Amino acid sequence: MLLLLLISSAFLLPWAGAGRIIGGKEVKRHSRPYMAYLHIQVLYPSSRKAYSCGGFLIGPDAVLSAAHCVDKNGTVRVTVTLGAHNISVRERSQQRIPVERWVTPPKYSSDGHINDIVLLKLKTKAKINKNVKQIAFSGSNERVTVGTKCSVAGWGWTAVEGRGSDVLMEVELKVQNDEPCKQLFHNYLRHSMMCVGDKKGKKTTYEGDSGGPFVCNQKAYGIVSRGVGTRPFPKVFTRISYFEPWIREQLRKFALQELPGSPSSD
Ligand SMILES: *[C@@H]1O[C@H](CO)[C@@H](O)[C@H](O)[C@H]1NC(C)=O
Ligand SMILES: *[C@@H]1O[C@H](CO)[C@@H](O)[C@H](O)[C@H]1NC(C)=O
């Protein structure tokens, strides 16, 4: 369902991005130096379609995002832009780097967005500077408590009937207990997902802020993963702590150049 939405919006709006932050505000330029903009070019069946996702830098050549962003029917080519604020402009701060390959957990399933996480390996290392920096992510024993307010940024749409934002927007959302997500998503898994959102429905991400980090206390705890149609509440984010050992292992493999070619499922 989400996949179809993503693809159909990509057909209509090649550059608009598959997601939207609603009820947020523009961030101070370069105050989120870990943010990555993913431009995803569909190569098959037609090469004229493209869409975008969010992501975040966790190593000089490593970006985390949502697996469903790169798992489309047909192959895709991914380019990451770091150091961006206004994505419609080629800012001097921007570093545009092609993605060499990526890896998803062996048990990733696009049906229900189970294990919706991907680690992208960049072709060249990013130059770390004041506009481009890594962010730490939560350890396997770290959890944020229900009620904690964390922030999520993206270049998605700013209204349901709106358009993509060219500047980076951010919204604060609360960690919820699992109940609203269990009710709405039959395959909600509390160990690997987190339930997030604004109960009043005034503030939200949509699916194409997909891949962006849910940041609590300067650390990434979640990855924007799924929602239902235009419903603003609740949203399911991938729980990073569950995947921490897997991420560390993949980073070691990146360093050793041992990864199989992408797309891969190891
Ligand atoms: C993927 O695309 C092919 C070719 O267009 C089509 O035959 C197939 O049904 C599609 N699969 C899914 C899951 O949409
Ligand atoms: C982003 O850049 C474009 C192109 O220069 C400009 O038209 C637009 O107003 C800018 N957006 C914002 C919010 O400053």
Where are these regions (language model features)?
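Active-site substrate-binding loop(s) of clan PA
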Residues: 91, 103-109, 125-165
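Conserved beta-strand elements of beta-rich interaction domains across eukaryotes
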Residues: 43, 62-63, 69-70, 85-87, ...
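Extracellular trypsin-like serine protease catalytic domains
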Residues: 35-45, 148-266
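Protease-domain processing segments flanking chymotrypsin-fold serine proteases, especially trypsin-like
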Residues: 1-64, 72, 78-79, 84, ...
